[in-house]
Amino acid sequence: MTTVRTLPIRVPPVAGEALDSWLEALAHRSATAFGDLLAAVGLNPYHGTATNGWIVALTSEQASAITAATAVSRDALTTMTLAHYSGRAVNIHPETPTLKRAFPWGNARGSRYCPTCMKDNGGRWQLSWRLGWSFACTEHHRLLVDVCPRCCAVPRRRTHVGDLIPNIGCCAHPAPQANGRIPARCDA
């Protein structure tokens, strides 16, 4: 792993926020492509999987690197990963940062969301919305949305495109009928 430098811009996490949401907010505020921000905080931006392992749990090295770059504590970082729910809502393989599928209602594929919460908090995604049993917003008394209203994709099924600056709170899937190496985003 390369040496991580302290980032000049700070964006505090929102209470209950998912790690990838906070990193996207940091990239957005820094006007930096998501992949470049991931590299700057010591995460591999091109892991090659649908969702990176650091969304599930951070390794000790990853947590140390992110803490060094952002000054956010290791404990705060852990609460932004699914490891926060380990043993209660999900089970994580101890040797790899992957979820055990045998745990009922543990992890949903992608994430649901409350549009009102997203509007109120500036487009930040709650970690609890990723849990399979999370289906309603207790603050706004409404069902969580589980597909993009424009492109019908499951939100947050993959991490944000590494070559683009995140448009937080907007769908990052390719727009319907978009094509090319980096197609236009849905942005709903």
Label every PLM stretch briefly.
Residues 6, 145-188:
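Domain-exit/linker segments immediately C-terminal to small folded modules
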Residues 1-110, 118, 123:
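A structured, charge-rich N-terminal accessory region that forms the first stable segment of a protein
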Residues 107-110, 130-133, 141-145, 164-168:
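Short metal-coordination and nucleic-acid-contact micro-motifs, chiefly zinc-binding Cys/His arrays
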